[in-house]
Amino acid sequence: MKAGLRTVRLELTEPLRISRSTMSAREAVWLSIAHEGVTGHGEAVTSAYYGLDAARLERLLAAAGADLARFPGPESALGALRAGEWPVDDTPPAVTAAVEAALLDLAGKRAGRPLHRLLGTSEAPVAATARTIGITSPAHAAAQARALAASGFEVIKVKAGSSDPEDDVERVRAVRAAAPRARLLLDPNGAWSPAVAGALLPRFAGLGVEAVEQPIAPGDPEALAALAARSPLPVVADEDAVSLEDVRRLAGRVHGVNVKLAKCGGVHAALRIAEAIEGSGTELMLGCITASSLGLAPAVHLAGRARWADLDGHLLLAHDPWTGIGGEDGRVRAGELPGLGVRPRGVSREDVA
């Protein structure tokens, strides 16, 4: 197997402000793995939060790509990955996820089967995805919500964590008025103290918010579990639910966990998490970070397994260089093309390697 890299810049349609940062663009590193005339693709994106800049991603992906030479094919490399034998233990989960995605794309193309079929799901998953509204004025949030509802979005996620919590309340109130039938999710990205969260959550419940992600700062899962026990609306762990061990500690103690493939290490890591929470009362949310359709595609093939799908990262881009998972009408769809089912924009189905 032979690997190659390409780094591109992904611009957002408009800056996305959350409680800890504002983002207008990020770099994506595309990994291609070629074997016997077939090529698989995966994507890793930069993240200041996880300490991953483009140079580090390029170095780590190049090292993983060079190491592929010891495997006879993608199937054996995937077996080693699933067994935890490869890549090395200190490889960041985002890098492991990108390598796994390229291998799964390659394996699926070699088998002539889409990823969801390789994972045992016969029907191509289709799911209503949340669409994110960042920290912005109530008027702008309302205009965005109105447009999203008109486009078919049934689920809207509102970012919170303003310096004045009343601004968050007013933003959610404006979104609720503009999209009265929408299901609302709230995400402060850990901005509140337990006391502030305890005071605010009943108010958001009164506005019909369906669930809140990571209301308090990560690092104290006991406090998060205690808040969930008394919260009037479901609490979903995100930054406190990174690894399988994190999730096991929280299973049955929070209402949901947000699994992002770049955070946990990829498709098979996500499946292990889903298995760990089964029957515990803790439900699965599939989330993402802002990326292209190539980066989102592996999660879309898992979307039928989740209570909540928040797979809109590609929809935040001014130009998505890949296509194949939908989402513009509020629903993401896994395709029936072999592998991940995506292709570079402007390339026909017949030309996909």
Residue spans of the language-model regions?
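Predominant activation on well-ordered alpha-helical scaffold segments within soluble catalytic domains
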Residues: E58, A62-G65, T96, E100, ...
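Conserved, mostly hydrophobic/aromatic
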Residues: L31, G37, V99, G112, ...
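Metal- or metallocofactor-binding catalytic centers and their adjacent structured scaffolds
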Residues: L5, I33-H35, T39-R110
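Metal-dependent enolase-superfamily TIM-barrel catalytic cores that perform enediolate-based chemistry
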Residues: R117-S231
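Short, P/G- and charge-enriched loop/turn segments at secondary-structure junctions
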Residues: P15-R20
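Hydrophobic faces of well-ordered beta-strands that scaffold small-molecule active sites
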Residues: G40-G42, A127-I133, E154-V158, L184-P188, ...
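Flexible C-terminal active-site loop/helix
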Residues: M1-L12, M23, E36, I289-A353
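Shared catalytic-loop signature of beta/alpha-barrel
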Residues: G208, G219-A226, R230-P234, A241-R331
